[in-house]
A protein has these predicted regions:
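Short, charged, solvent-exposed linker or helix-capping segments at domain edges/interfaces
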Residues: 95-100
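Flexible, low-complexity linker/hinge segments
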Residues: 101-113
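Non-catalytic interaction-recognition regions
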Residues: 1-94, 112-597
């Protein structure tokens, strides 16, 4: 904050004048004053005692008196046990608000051609099922992180790796071939990803029937699966796919295209997008090539059964399979190839993988393998590891068909938002189109905010009912407050009030108003902190605190009915800047805010 920098400079000058000592800004510990004490900023004086050779209280008193004489930003001070509490002059707060008011994109660092390039991978779906609740948290975190990193002055490439090949894909293909009767998205009226997901579940159920019958004959579960003709057919289909069989490839392409059309609808509704999409089918051969190079160089080794492994025991890990005995690849193989292609395609300064914490070990291994293969970027990979998300009912499983689909969840959220908004009268005097748009904005905002306000590293339970409350730490509470401020500003415009670009520094404001300005000013630091910690939750909870503080101000003070024109203008400018920061912060979370509600 500018005021802190100004006072820090004065403290440095004061230490020099009072004690003849040179100190740097990093030695000046200036922090927000605790609520139970009077003041805005508190200086910790203990680091200066060896310079002053006096008690903490006396040192604080002398520095306070110096600031009062020499720094106009300091209006008064008090000393509590060696802590110097400073009250900032009223004119400084108004001046700070003027400065923020001049900046439409306050807190956002502009991106230039020289800015570092950050690539962020998120989503990573399989083409054998629709996106589910787990993908929702992944997509929302990845998209929000991309906006936060851009706001910190980075060029951004949002990327997705689609797992479009492998045995799990062949299971859906085989089920469609055997029992699909030529079903298409058009003939069934289903989204393509949902249709293919149905066949994945069907395969799982048919496999259970077959293995249970074999187990009834006395076979163990493992023996039954090994003798399963269905699994044998699926493996044969995968072998044919890898061999480039035309019929298998044509079926694969047709079914994957159905899925992509479905995914695109889901991404559009969710409000997330990508700059570059990679497909495992296009990267796994690159990975296999790199593994074979590593084998030739003695970095990896081959076992008797023909499989290729990496021995990472000297790195404190175990042995890692890279190619199966039949020559087929594993996820690690593909990730090696994808990483290589990405760094060939872009001058990446930082590569961030948004992937759940169950893959912590995987990315630890990937980083070491890339380093062993001689890729400098290996050590710099960032795994943005996040916790699992569940519904109150418990975990999700896709093989049994009991998974919570992203499409169904979003539709349910919008429907609930519509009902609650109607009950509360928030859709009155709106056209059906406007009302539907508000239901969409509030429903999706509820979902996004509830997920993003949680520390990404923690497991969480998504509670739809709690998320859509218009009170408390929720998206609708923030959205409604924004709409309320916009309503006040519209009424001011209707009364012919033009907001001044600069407020005079000659009138007094309350402590609550000073605190609100301080909170607005904090936004720039919050954006930096969110980028440093890779945490949208920093932004979400800051915006909630700001909105909560504004609502208290709105309750306690008149705005349009204020008789003093200077104070009225000040409160309107203050409100406008709260709205500006709320909109900016919610945008970093990928959440829309309505102009009216």
């Amino acid at each position: 904050m500018v005021i802190e920098q100004q006072i820090t400079g004065a403290i440095i000058a004061g230490i020099k004048e009072l004690y003849g000592a040179d100190v740097t800004a990093s030695q000046v510990q200036l922090q927000k004053t605790k609520k139970e004490f009077k003041g805005h900023l508190t200086l910790v004086v203990f680091p200066f005692l060896r310079m002053s050779k006096k008690s903490p209280e006396q040192t604080a008193q002398e520095i306070g008196e110096y600031l009062l004489r020499n720094e106009p930003a300091v209006a008064e001070f008090n000393v509590i046990k060696g802590f110097l509490n400073l009250t900032v002059a009223c004119s400084c707060w108004i001046d700070l608000l003027n400065s923020i008011n001049e900046q439409p994109a306050y807190g956002i660092i502009p991106v230039t051609e020289q800015s570092p390039l950050v690539m962020i991978e998120y989503s990573s779906p399989n083409t054998n099922k629709p996106l589910h609740l787990g993908h929702v948290r992944n997509n929302l975190l990845g998209y929000s992180l991309s906006k936060i990193m851009k706001a910190n002055g980075n060029q951004i490439v949002k990327t997705n790796i689609v797992n479009d090949r492998g045995i799990h894909i062949c299971k859906s293909m085989l089920a469609w071939q055997k029992w699909g009767n030529g079903a298409t998205p058009e003939s069934t009226g289903k989204k393509g990803d949902h249709l293919i997901g149905d066949f994945y579940v069907l395969f799982s159920n048919k496999l259970k029937e077959e293995t249970h019958a074999l187990e009834a004959k006395g076979l163990t579960k493992e023996e039954a699966e090994a003798q399963s003709t269905l699994m044998a057919e699926a493996r044969e289909m995968l072998r044919k796919w890898e061999a480039g069989d035309k019929e298998v490839r044509a079926l694969w392409e047709m079914m994957n295209n159905w899925v992509y059309a479905g995914f695109n609808e889901t991404y559009k509704m969710m409000g997330v997008d990508f700059d570059k999409i990679y497909y495992e089918s296009q990267t796994y051969l690159e990975g296999k090539g790199k593994v074979m190079e590593g084998l030739e160089k003695g970095i990896f080794y081959r076992r008797e059964d023909g499989s290729v492994w990496a021995d990472l025991t000297k790195d404190g890990l175990d042995e890692k399979l890279l190619l199966r005995a039949d020559g087929t690849s594993v996820y690690m193989t593909q990730d090696i190839g994808t990483a290589k292609l990405r760094f060939d395609d872009y001058p990446i300064n930082k590569m961030i993988y948004v992937v759940g914490n169950e893959q912590n070990y995987h990315f630890q291994v990937l980083s070491i393998l890339l380093d062993k293969l001689g890729f400098e970027f290996g050590k710099g990979l960032v795994h943005f590891s996040y916790g699992m998300v569940e519904l109150p009912e418990g975990k999700m499983k896709s093989r049994e068909g009991t998974v919570v689909d992203a499409d169904d969840l979003m539709a349910e959220m919008i429907s609930t938002a519509r009902e609650i908004s109607q009950e509360l009268g928030k859709l009155n005097e709106m056209t059906p189109e406007e009302a539907e748009n508000i239901a969409r904005i509030v429903g999706l905002g509820s979902l996004k905010y509830f997920i993003l306000k949680v520390d990404p590293r923690k497991n969480m339970t998504f509670n739809p009912k709690e998320s859509i409350d218009f009170n408390g730490n929720t998206g609708p509470f923030i959205q409604y407050t924004y709409a309320r401020i916009r309503s006040v500003l519209r009424k001011a415009a209707e009364q012919g009030i033009a907001l001044p670009e600069q407020l005079p520094l000659t009138f007094a404001i309350s402590e609550k108003e000073e605190n609100l300005i301080q909170m607005i000013a904090d936004y720039a630091e919050i954006v930096k902190e969110a980028g440093k910690l890779y945490s949208p939750a920093c932004v979400a909870n800051y915006i909630y605190d700001l909105v909560k503080e504004y609502n208290q101000f709105y309750h306690d003070f008149s705005i349009l009915r204020e008789e003093n024109p200077e104070l009225k203008n000040f409160r309107l400018v203050l409100s406008a800047n709260v709205a500006k920061i709320v909109k900016s912060g919610m945008d970093l979370l990928g959440i829309e805010v309505p102009e009216r509600m």
